[in-house]
C-alpha cells in the first residue's frame, strides 16, 4: 500500500483529495495545524486517515510527518483574499518556509515524488482565455499585498522546478476556482449566496459584475488531480479547471433564481 503525506489536508481541497485517495486504497497521513482547516472534513475517514497536528513552517514537524512516505502532496497555504491584505507576511511565511521544509525533508528522506499545489492566481489577468500553462505568470504590483499569495505560489513553483533533479516526479498543478460543500465563506460563491439569502431587494457587488470566472466542482477537480497523479509527467505543470466562463453578475442571477426571489435587483 503506497503512503501519501498531504500537507494542508484538513483544508477544503486537501481534505477532498485525502478522502478520495483513501477510498482508492492509499494510506494517507495529513499534516495540518487546523488554522483554517477543519478536522471534521475527514471525520468519516478518520479511522483510515492518520492526522498529525503540526506546523508546515517548522522543519521538525514536516520531517517527522514525512517519514516512510512514498509521495508528498503539498497543499498547505493561507488562502482567502481577506488574508492576502490583512496578513501578507504570514501568507508568505507559510508559502516560503513550507516549500523549503517539504523539499528538504523529501531530499533527506529520499522521497521521490512530490505534487505541488500552485494557483490560477499566478496568471493574474491572463492575455488569453481559456488560459493554458504557457501563459506567463506575473506579479503586476510588487507593493500590493494582494499578490502575497500569488508570489508565494510562484516561489513554490520555482523551488520545485529548480530542485527537480532530486526527484522522479516533481509535478505542479494550478487549481482554478474550485467550489463545493464546506469550502468556507471567504470565496465568491458562498459570499454571493450569503448576500442573496440575507438581502431583501438588492445586493451590492464588488466592481462592475462583468468580471468572468470559470468554476470547477470539487469532485471534478479531485478526479482530474487523480488523472494527473496516475499519468502526469515529471516537471510538467497542469491547470485544473473548466473552460465554461460565467460573469459574476450572471452568477448572482443564478443564485437569485435558486432562492426564488422576485423583484430583485
Regions found by a protein language model. Give the residues of each.
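C-terminal substrate-binding subdomain of Rossmann-fold SDR/epimerase-dehydratase oxidoreductases
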Residues: 17, 54, 197-265
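N-terminal Rossmann-like NAD(P)+-binding domain of SDR-like oxidoreductases, especially those catalyzing
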Residues: 1-178, 229, 248
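Loop/helix-junction capping segments adjacent to catalytic residues or to phosphate/diphosphate-binding pockets
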Residues: 59, 182, 215
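Residue-level signature of the cytosolic catalytic core of signaling kinases
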Residues: 45, 181-185, 244
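Heptad-repeat alpha-helical coiled-coil signaling segments
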Residues: 177, 183, 210-213
Amino acid at each position: 500500500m503506497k503512503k501519501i503525506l498531504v500537507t494542508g489536508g484538513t483544508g477544503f481541497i486537501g481534505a477532498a483529495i485525502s478522502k478520495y485517495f483513501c477510498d482508492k486504497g492509499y494510506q494517507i497521513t495529513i499534516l495540518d495545524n487546523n488554522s483554517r482547516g477543519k478536522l471534521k472534513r475527514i471525520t468519516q475517514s478518520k479511522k483510515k486517515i492518520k492526522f498529525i497536528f503540526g506546523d508546515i513552517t517548522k522543519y521538525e514537524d514536516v520531517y517527522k510527518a514525512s517519514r516512510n512516505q512514498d509521495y508528498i502532496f503539498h497543499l498547505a497555504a493561507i488562502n482567502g483574499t481577506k488574508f492576502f491584505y490583512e496578513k501578507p507576511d504570514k501568507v508568505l511565511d507559510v508559502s516560503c518556509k513550507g516549500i523549503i521544509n517539504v523539499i528538504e525533508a523529501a531530499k533527506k528522506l529520499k522521497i521521490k515524488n512530490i505534487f505541488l499545489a500552485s494557483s490560477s492566481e499566478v496568471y493574474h489577468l491572463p492575455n488569453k482565455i481559456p488560459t493554458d500553462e504557457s501563459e506567463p505568470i506575473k506579479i503586476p504590483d510588487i507593493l500590493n499585498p494582494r499578490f502575497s499569495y500569488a508570489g508565494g505560489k510562484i516561489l513554490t513553483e520555482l523551488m520545485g522546478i529548480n530542485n527537480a533533479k532530486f526527484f522522479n516526479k516533481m509535478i505542479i498543478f494550478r487549481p482554478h476556482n474550485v467550489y463545493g460543500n464546506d469550502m468556507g465563506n471567504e470565496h465568491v460563491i458562498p459570499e454571493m449566496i450569503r448576500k442573496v439569502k440575507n438581502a431583501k431587494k438588492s445586493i451590492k457587488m464588488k466592481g462592475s459584475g462583468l468580471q468572468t470566472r470559470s468554476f470547477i466542482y470539487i469532485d471534478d477537480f479531485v478526479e482530474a488531480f487523480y488523472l494527473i497523479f496516475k499519468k502526469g509527467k515529471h516537471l510538467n505543470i497542469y491547470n485544473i479547471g473548466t473552460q465554461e466562463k460565467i460573469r459574476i453578475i450572471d452568477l448572482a442571477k443564478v443564485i437569485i433564481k435558486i432562492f426564488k426571489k422576485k423583484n430583485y435587483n
